[in-house]
């Protein structure tokens, strides 16, 4: 590996980066809206040049004909900082994809606006899609017109458009034709405005388990013995269906469902399996690896885990299952005996699901747990086998402690769930990296989340301190970087892990600030990332290596009666769009250094078309939407939030906009604030902030705070 001494590195990087560079743009963006470009080396008096891509074609021709550029037009920026440039798209700009470049003494490489930006794909079998199954694609600017199309391209170059396409700008879904040949394909997307190759998809035959039926009624009258015998027979057979006819069945032991086996009841309302109130419950009531459970109800009292799968599991399906898991059934409070029986000492014990395997689906279930309901939580460093590629959809969820703990995600579809805190101590919901290097690629959409009054009551939070390095670099060679000092690994384990593959290698400040890459390999001071930086770091750059929580899509959810929706402790490339909130603490990004274990900034977070209908609640403050930071000190006083965009949000009934802390290069545009003393709270530590075309109705002081004088404010036309 080629290494450079620090002095040589500085000279080489300076030579490479003399021209302007733009590495991120705030897509989607429309006419008369502001584009935020992140980059640097703008030079003196830079101008932006914009050119449209050719008009869209229909599939499949759109996938085989390259687009052409129209005429370049120049636009003068409205705000320039060392790391960002803002300009307004002319009101006459037609919708579409545009090539953008910055011209000063030199010309920057092109960056595209509104081009499809695929983040990840997922099939009905996790990383794969089955013939006749589905594939979904997630990201930015995906379905922008009626000409949107998905297609598969085989190794010979043949392109097959996919039918049954549905979607929006954040996700697109289509059916995989049953007539295709199994194999590896390129997934192609046309948004209607532009095209992109979205990744590799493996197409497989439908998964077929054996259908031999083992009727519980044929195995005796003792329910526990009959169940164990039927499961054993299915295991001996290599799988099958253990069928449970109408009835109530007391089960006194833990059950292990064999691989390839479906535990199927006659109906959710017709079949009940119930366990006694164990003084010492088993580790799990049901161990479910590579199997399915459907059409029945489970009742239990004291429990550790109701349904568990393990890291080796590669397929789990749970559909139309009702679960009532109340460890405090017929008790008044934790630790207080009643009628000679003792309840658990703590409210937080117990999990309905504890999943560590891959390719799981929990759909159309009715779930109530006195502790946690969804613990996608291996509670350890997973390495190359994490709880990845899941679907949790269409469920009714009630809980006593927490609805979900999501740790080490990579591809989770969490949608159309109704989630209610039930109990005075029902707390919040987390997406975490306590033990691991990442939680990424989450689609969290069309859920209703409500009634959380316990603990921190976060309606949704990213969480966990952790880090591997803060400091300078000694050398750069493409995607290989040499740290200037030894890394220091910190996480929640007694002995922190040292393999940081998948973590975020972030440029906090200095040259290239606001960029990040994903770690692919590390050993001592030698680190490799997934691709070179567009604007490489140099001796002036400050680096933070910390867990990657990002590429999350929070879309069209409703949050009521709870605490904050917060991108806490760092978020990268995160969309918060179309959500509604009432009687909550608001929606905001929050960059900081939890526990002093690692600096975790917020980069590229966009809050679009959200609404807070009621800004009052239990909190000492009114609700707000925006960004804040914390924990800055003499070691690092610089920005912990960059490229924050607030657009078309509505804040009502004592809710407001807020930028507080070390925020750099942010935008608030076309937002509306109604019925409040203050419309916008802006603090002096924020730099490079633009407020444009925001409107205020019945607001005493539209702009307030010690940062007003530093901000650029362009009032809305009257």
Regions found by a protein language model. Name each.
Residues 123-125, 453-538:
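Autoprocessing Asn-cyclization modules and mimics
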Residues 465-482, 491-493, 536-542, 669-674, ...:
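Acidic, glycine- and Ser/Thr-rich low-complexity intrinsically disordered tracts
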């Amino acid at each position: 590996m080629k290494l450079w001494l620090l002095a040589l590195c500085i000279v080489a990087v300076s030579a490479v980066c003399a021209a302007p560079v733009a590495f991120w743009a705030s897509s989607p963006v429309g006419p008369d809206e502001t584009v935020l470009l992140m980059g640097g080396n703008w030079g003196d008096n830079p101008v932006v040049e914009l050119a449209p891509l050719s008009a869209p074609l229909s599939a499949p021709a759109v996938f085989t004909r390259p687009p052409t550029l129209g005429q370049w037009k120049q636009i003068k920026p409205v705000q320039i900082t060392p790391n960002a440039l803002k300009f307004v798209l002319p009101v006459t700009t037609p919708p579409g994809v545009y090539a953008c470049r910055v011209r000063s003494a030199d010309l920057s490489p092109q960056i595209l606006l509104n081009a499809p930006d695929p983040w990840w794909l997922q099939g009905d079998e996790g990383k794969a899609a089955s013939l006749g199954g589905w594939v979904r694609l997630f990201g930015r600017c995906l379905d922008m017109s009626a000409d949107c199309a998905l297609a598969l391209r085989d190794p010979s170059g043949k392109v097959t458009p996919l039918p049954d396409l549905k979607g929006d700008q954040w996700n697109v879904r289509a059916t995989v034709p049953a007539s295709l040949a199994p194999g590896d394909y390129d997934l192609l997307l046309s948004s209607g405005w532009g095209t992109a190759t979205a990744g590799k998809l493996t197409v497989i035959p439908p998964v077929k388990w054996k259908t031999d039926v083992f009727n519980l009624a044929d195995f005796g009258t003792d329910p526990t013995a009959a169940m164990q015998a039927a499961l054993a027979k299915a295991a001996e057979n290599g799988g099958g269906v253990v069928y449970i006819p109408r009835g109530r069945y007391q089960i006194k032991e833990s059950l292990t469902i064999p691989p390839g086996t479906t535990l199927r009841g006659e109906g959710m309302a017709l079949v009940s399996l119930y366990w006694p109130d164990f003084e010492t419950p088993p580790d799990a009531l049901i161990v479910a690896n590579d199997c399915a459970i459907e059409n029945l109800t489970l009742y239990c009292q004291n429990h550790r885990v109701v349904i568990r799968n393990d890291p080796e599991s590669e397929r789990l399906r749970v559909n139309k299952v009702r679960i009532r898991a109340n460890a405090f059934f017929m008790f008044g409070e934790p630790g207080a005996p009643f009628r000679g029986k003792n309840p658990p000492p703590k409210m937080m014990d117990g999990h309905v699901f504890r999943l560590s395997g891959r390719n799981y689906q929990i759909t159309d279930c009715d779930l109530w747990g006195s502790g946690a309901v969804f613990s996608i939580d291996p509670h350890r460093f997973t390495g190359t086998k994490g709880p990845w590629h899941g679907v949790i959809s269409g469920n009714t969820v009630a809980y006593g402690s927490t609805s979900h703990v999501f740790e080490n995600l990579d591809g989770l579809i969490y949608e159309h769930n109704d989630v209610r805190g039930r109990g005075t101590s029902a707390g919040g919901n987390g997406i975490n990296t306590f033990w691991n290097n990442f939680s990424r690629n989450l689609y969290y959409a069309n859920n209703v989340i409500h009634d959380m009054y316990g603990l921190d009551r976060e309606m949704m939070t990213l969480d966990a301190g952790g880090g591997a390095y803060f400091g300078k670099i000694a050398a750069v060679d493409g995607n290989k970087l040499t740290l200037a000092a030894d890394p220091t690994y910190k996480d929640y384990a007694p002995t922190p892990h040292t393999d940081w593959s998948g973590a975020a290698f972030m440029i906090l400040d200095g040259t290239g600030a606001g960029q990040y890459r994903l770690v692919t390999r590390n050993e001592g001071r030698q680190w490799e990332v997934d691709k070179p930086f567009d604007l490489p770091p140099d001796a002036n750059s400050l680096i933070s290596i910390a867990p990657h929580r990002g590429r999350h899509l929070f879309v069209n959810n409703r949050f009521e009666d709870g605490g904050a929706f917060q991108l806490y402790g760092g978020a990268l490339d995160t969309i918060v769009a179309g959500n509604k909130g009432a009687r909550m603490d608001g929606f905001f990004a929050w960059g900081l250094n939890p526990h002093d274990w690692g600096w975790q900034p917020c980069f590229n977070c966009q809050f679009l078309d959200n609404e807070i209908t009621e800004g009052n609640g239990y909190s000492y403050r009114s609700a707000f939407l925006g960004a804040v930071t914390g924990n800055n000190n003499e070691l690092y006083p610089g920005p912990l939030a960059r490229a924050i965009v607030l657009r078309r949000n509505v804040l009502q009934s004592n809710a407001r906009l807020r930028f507080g802390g070390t925020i750099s290069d942010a935008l608030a545009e076309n937002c509306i604030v109604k019925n409040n003393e203050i419309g916008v709270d802006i603090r002096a530590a924020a730099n490079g902030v633009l407020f444009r075309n925001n409107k205020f109705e019945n607001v005493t002081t539209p702009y307030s705070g010690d940062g007003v004088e530093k901000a650029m404010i362009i009032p809305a036309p009257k």
